[in-house]
Amino acid sequence: MTPFEPPAAVPRPRLERLVSGTDVRARADRLRVTAAYALMLLAVSVTLTALGRHARAAVVSEMSTNLHNLAHGHLGALVGSAFVSDGGDVYLWLPGLVCLLALGELIWRGRGLLITFAVGHIGATVIVAVGLVAAVETGRLPFSVARATDVGISYGAVCVLGALTASIPLRLRPAWIGWWLGIAVAAAVDADFTAFGHVLALLLGMALSFRLPSIPRWTGMHAALLVVGAAFAYFVLSGSSPLAAPVGGLTGAVIAVPLAGRVMRSTAAGSVSPSPFRPGSDSPSTVASRSPA
């Protein structure tokens, strides 16, 4: 009579292995910047809501990166404005922002995400400020714009979106670029300076994307983060132009795809220069070497 043998261990399902404690902790460690920023946004929002409308208005006024504050040396607003929201609806858009930032941090690590967000938030703010100064001095805009409210995360978030360009598969990249540029430009027509800042932040991100690491292989998790993050970015960019934005995006994609194909064909044709000599015939150097002395 054979002794009892315990049944062989059955391997755990793949899903269970993927969500094991070690794997979850490893992924969480790679999202420290995203998690810390989200918690700070929540903490600031909860605190300002508890303090009341007057306290929120005072903080928003102090942290606004408008011409008045920048001209008076309030350079701390360039950083502080990224943690303050003009409204109390942070709970509605924070999940989308977290997905967008998480995807960026998974691809570029924490340092890359910080650099990208800072380039968009500070870079677009400074460029917009220079443009506003010129517009006010030439009389194109009233002087009251110098005290306009300008806080929030949108410039940095849009720059992160643009910086994903190099990670988009090559065959889809022209449509990606045309779609987002079309939306941003359409929303900027007859809009305030914030919409123009979004265009600048998007262009800064796209330019920066080719100096950042690109994703080696897309997974289901990456795709899910992109879908949610892109939906959030769409609502940020479309702003007060919900009808013009999709038309602009489709127009941009329709223009960008054939234009990119034409550029690639011309580049490929220019890189191949046909030789004037048939295969096997004498080259100029060979002919010269055979000439009499």
Feature annotation, model-predicted:
Residues M1-V24, A187-A293:
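C-terminal transmembrane module of polytopic alpha-helical membrane proteins
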Residues F143-A163, I168, F193-A201:
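Membrane-interface micro-motifs in multi-pass membrane enzymes
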Residues E16-V60:
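N-terminal signal-anchor transmembrane alpha helix
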Residues T49-G110, L132:
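N-terminal TM1-TM2 helical hairpin plus the immediately adjacent luminal interfacial "cap"
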Residues L31-V44, A175-L181, L225-A230:
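Alpha-helical transmembrane segments
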Residues L106-G112, L164-A175, F210-M221:
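Membrane-helix interface "capping/anchor" motifs
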Residues L113-S144:
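Hydrophobic alpha-helical transmembrane segments of integral membrane proteins
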Residues A77, L94-A102, A157-A163, G178-A187, ...:
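Hydrophobic, membrane-inserted alpha-helices
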